[in-house]
């Protein structure tokens, strides 16, 4: 027997979640029906409020969901779907989200590009977890009409496909955000002969060349025309050979901190022209100022003399490796001095072998998000994710929404059915 949700409440509230509810209901009825005596017709009353609390009450076949936004509603609805047994009687769930923006960065640049249907499936999972952002990491895997070789033979998304994904994400209250590259990590784009004139090193653009910024404007225009949001992640990380290739031959040596600031200023001009709200990975700003590795900054560092980004540029602090809260504290102290717009990006640890390293994911996520909460970081995302990282994503979501630690003995070396039972609590 399938479940049928009957939505109740203010019409304006129902309109925000009606389509998404129908999609999740249909998916459940096709794939996840419970055996036994369960409620079929379930009346759901929805209310939205200003606070970040989520409260779900189930009294037999009557459910009340009081929440902040659609993404939180769908998390509550997913809990209801897993607690429909008549024998369970009355039950309730209370949680609070600690970050206004939270979500996943889906890696669509390495090994394979997710199909549109697979991205939609990931969106449904994010909705069930209560996350409200999805970043598509596409180095060269999106269509730029004026650059036919950009992403060719790489499974790039067409503009129509991105728009389709975007519209689907909006159904669940999830903001689809482009995450591209405008400095380094562009090996696949720069391998073509037509791109040689804008190349510094094999994967880095040459700073200061007018052709470089004409190229970047084409990228940003294509992105603006494909995505609903005005937010954009410009990348710019790990450009360790910046200024040491063709730039050095043509212009002589220039400190990387000056080059990154010059490049950011030019790209920001384009963003202002197009009405975009940019952010970048922060490592180049930090390493170019210290002359050391990203995390090698002193305790209580004074950044008053550092070259800093423009006020409107967000900085994304990425940290996939550390389990010590003191490291996160010193790094967030530096970021707070550099920008008022900080985003934290953790990692799902799927890149170290043929299987995800869940233990490392759990340990790092706990340390990172505990510290981000303490420092009131407004936005957090889980990075470099694929479908084999879903348990890590679930861990991330639970730290975002509620204070929960994932005891490894409940997860490691468990059967699929045991894992499902744990995740559906």
Language model region names:
Residues 28, 171-172, 274, 338, ...:
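Helix C-cap/helix->beta junction micro-motif
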Residues 190-203, 288-305, 373, 378, ...:
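Short, electropositive alpha-helical surface patch
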